[in-house]
């Protein structure tokens, strides 16, 4: 549960300088704390979160995951931030097609700390309730704004998709949504089967 995850991350000794894992220009931009992944509690939390994410129907439809790279647990205390950056193309040998942030703190527990994603020149500021996940292409420029009060806890990670192209993934996600809508509306099975077959064939066509 979310409460159990937060309890497991409450130990002060669990946290270290987050800049140790950043590379290139991101290293200079990163000012946060990161859970020691050698710690059994942190490792257990990461395994639980990864399994839950990969089992989620919405994530499976949107990401079509082939693999998930290691997760990181981070904490931003007052004055900490992560400047604008693009995630590395590979993490632990896994191609990063999609990045995600799972919020572990409620928005009223900290000030500032918004995840800001630059999508085609338009910026979206994201502060979601604890337990909420945002999934976005790893090619997007993004940052975490300075925390002005309290502490912001989150899990971040990366997914390799079976579909490399973000545009193709978006089309397949729309088809999955249409199939769900047709099922809810009681559409004939033959109609739904034709659309499902089309989606499966597109996955074959688009897939690596």
Regions inferred by a protein language model and the residue ranges of each:
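Non-heme Fe(II)/2-oxoglutarate
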Residues: 1-65, 171-208
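Catalytic core of non-heme Fe(II) oxygenases with the double-stranded beta-helix
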Residues: 57-173
């Amino acid at each position: 549960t979310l409460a159990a995850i937060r309890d497991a991350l409450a130990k002060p000794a669990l946290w270290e300088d987050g800049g140790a894992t950043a590379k290139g220009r991101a290293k200079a931009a990163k000012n946060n704390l990161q859970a020691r992944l050698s710690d059994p509690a942190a490792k257990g939390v990461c395994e639980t979160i990864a399994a839950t994410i990969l089992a989620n129907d919405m994530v499976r439809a949107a990401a079509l995951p082939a693999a998930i790279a290691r997760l990181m647990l981070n904490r931003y205390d007052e004055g900490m931030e992560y400047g604008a950056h693009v995630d590395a193309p590979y993490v632990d040998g896994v191609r990063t097609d999609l990045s995600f942030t799972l919020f572990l703190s409620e928005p009223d527990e900290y000030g500032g700390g918004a995840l800001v994603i630059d999508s085609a020149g338009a910026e979206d500021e994201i502060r979601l309730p604890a337990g909420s996940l945002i999934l976005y292409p790893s090619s997007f420029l993004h940052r975490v704004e300075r925390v002005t009060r309290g502490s912001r806890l989150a899990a971040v990670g990366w997914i390799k998709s079976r579909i490399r192209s973000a545009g193709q993934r978006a089309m397949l996600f729309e088809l999955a949504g249409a199939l769900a809508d047709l099922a809810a509306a009681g559409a004939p099975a033959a109609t739904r089967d034709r659309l499902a077959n089309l989606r499966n064939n597109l996955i074959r066509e688009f897939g690596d």
